[in-house]
Swiss-Prot record:
Species: Xylella fastidiosa (strain M12)
GO biological process, one term: translation
Gene: rpsJ
NCBIfam families: PRK00596.1, rpsJ_bact
PANTHER family in the cross-refs: 30S RIBOSOMAL PROTEIN S10 FAMILY MEMBER
Name of this protein: Small ribosomal subunit protein uS10
Length: 103
């Protein structure tokens, strides 16, 4: 696996959960002897939704809700077979979306 990189993108609604998962990935990769760059925080996507509270005429009565999507990216440089096996066996939290790309 010479001259290869593994890109791991993490996405979650809870920033503590994504940071804990990124830490587990970094620890696992370093334990197997690979070099890790990251976790690099990507811009947070904030979606806001405004809902009218009053069912009739009160336009001033509104509630606002927002959801924040946090993202991190990790690069594992020069991975070996142990690194790939350890990452495949790694159990992450249920609220974290993981995308893995081999370049």
């Amino acid at each position: 696996m010479a001259d290869q990189k593994i890109q791991i993108r993490l996405k979650a609604f809870d920033c503590r959960l994504i940071d804990r998962s990124a830490g587990e990935i970094v620890e696992t990769a370093k334990r197997t002897g690979a070099h890790v760059r990251g976790p690099i925080p990507l811009p947070t996507k904030i979606e806001r939704c405004t809902i009218l509270v009053s069912p009739h005429a009160d336009k001033d009565a509104r509630d606002q809700y927002e959801t924040c999507t946090y993202k991190r990216v990790l690069y594992i440089v020069d991975p070996n077979d142990k690194t790939v096996d350890a990452l495949m066996r790694l159990e992450l939290a249920a609220g974290v979306d993981v995308q893995i790309k081999l370049t």
